[in-house]
């Protein structure tokens, strides 16, 4: 339990419930998306302990350093402390606001600090690529989560 308190204090990730307080319309769109149940997908496949799967299905899971060739969308998480486990950080399960918009702790502390602007297509393909998402078409799926 102490680890959780320390982690929460130091983590730049706040979770979607905090975002929802000020961004209810975006949250409503998210709740209808498959992103909102991404962790359950892993549990159903018994992959909820696989680091390669967790990297995209939870917020801020990055037990390794981003490579120099990684995109800015991936490198924004480098050195950040996000999801640890279902027991310790349940508020960071699923694909949430901070997966795409980056850590929001600074924004929560000061609303003048805005999340970094990113090209949505480049952020999406960090997870939706290759064998992980062979049928992914940005234009088709963007319409389902656009907010």
Task: Give the role of each language-model region.
Residues 1-147:
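Short sequence/structural segments immediately N-terminal
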